[in-house]
Amino acid sequence: MSEVKVGKNESLDSALKRFKRSCQKAGVLQDIRKHEHYEKPSIKKKKKSEAARKKKRF
């Protein structure tokens, strides 16, 4: 969980930017999107092998 403490002279906008940046670095949104819908294990394997094949080709 990302946590940001707001300083005395810090604006809310800059604190929000820091929070968004820390969430992006932690991969929170990617994890939420990944778990948004259930994927069968066979489909996970298929996607993983396709990604490896694409990566190997380039």
Curated annotation (Swiss-Prot):
The keyword Kinase does not apply. Residues 43-58 have a biased composition (Basic residues). Keywords: Ribonucleoprotein, Ribosomal protein. Transmembrane segments: none annotated. Coiled coil: none annotated. InterPro entries: Ribosomal_bS21 (IPR001911), Ribosomal_bS21_CS (IPR018278), Ribosomal_bS21_sf (IPR038380). It comes from the Bacteria. One of its GO terms (biological process) is translation. Pfam families: Ribosomal_S21. One of its GO terms (molecular function) is structural constituent of ribosome. The keyword Ribonucleoprotein applies. GO terms for cellular component: ribonucleoprotein complex; ribosome. Residues 31-42 have a biased composition (Basic and acidic residues). Residues 28-58 are annotated as: Disordered. Belongs to the bacterial ribosomal protein bS21 family. This is Small ribosomal subunit protein bS21. It comes from Syntrophomonas wolfei subsp. wolfei (strain DSM 2245B / Goettingen). The lineage of its organism: Bacteria, Bacillati, Bacillota, Clostridia, Eubacteriales. The gene is rpsU.
